[in-house]
Amino acid sequence: MDSQLSKNDVQQMLRIASGATLGFAISKALDWPNPIFFTLYPILLLGLVAVLNGHIIRQFLAATIFPAAAVLVVYGLFGSHPLLITPLIAITFAFLFWQMSKGTLYLFGAFSLVGLSLQLHFASYSSDGIDIYALVISNIGAILLALIIAFALHIVFPDEEPRTPLPKAAKDKASIRHEVILCTTVATLSFAVFQTFDLVDSISAQAASVLILFPLCWKGATLSGWQRALGTLIGCNLALLAQLILLNYSDTLFFASFSLWILVFFISRQHV
């Protein structure tokens, strides 16, 4: 990896750190449920793509509707029937990975997969008092807020140099089919594991099991999984260090948000 940061890299790092912090601070200040949605989605939107245009916005908006419909209709009707819900979710995953593999609607598939996986994880604990409807509304609100934040930050921290569009790799039908089968199998196994065991506090692991599949190949997923494991180790230790430094002030929103901004800005260096 090139150690030299470009001006655009620094601007993107500022957008990622500020987006995560704004989403976190707003959700906490207004006491909104599921703050993980409000913190994660700005990171995804500002981290996966370095630009913001109509095609990206349409995909992101579509990713608010698809997971909500899947959770309310598919899981709402068949969630209590494991032998029915598992193949239905597998078909849903296959459709989304197919969109990603084709490339044109990659972001729609990626955003939908993350939102769907998180909501399915929480929805499986509806008997423990988690309201599915409030969960879906919270997810939609987080996506819309992430768009607003992204708009604002692209104005405040715009690119300083023109970006060269990435070349599109041509894929044959066999390659697409292989990627869809591989990723769908892994995602469905992850879904089954998190539905079977009591892992209500393991939402980050659920999200990670989907995020590592974004390269759409075994080698890429393996490398991504290793990097994510290292990132989790580093991130958790940095968070503990921040808690140790803040001590009794860790419950103060300003200090918690400021420490989050510093840590995300530091870690985003490894992403851009």
Where on the chain are the PLM-derived regions?
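Alpha-helical transmembrane segments and their membrane-interface boundaries
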Residues: M1-S112, L116, L120-I262, F266-V272
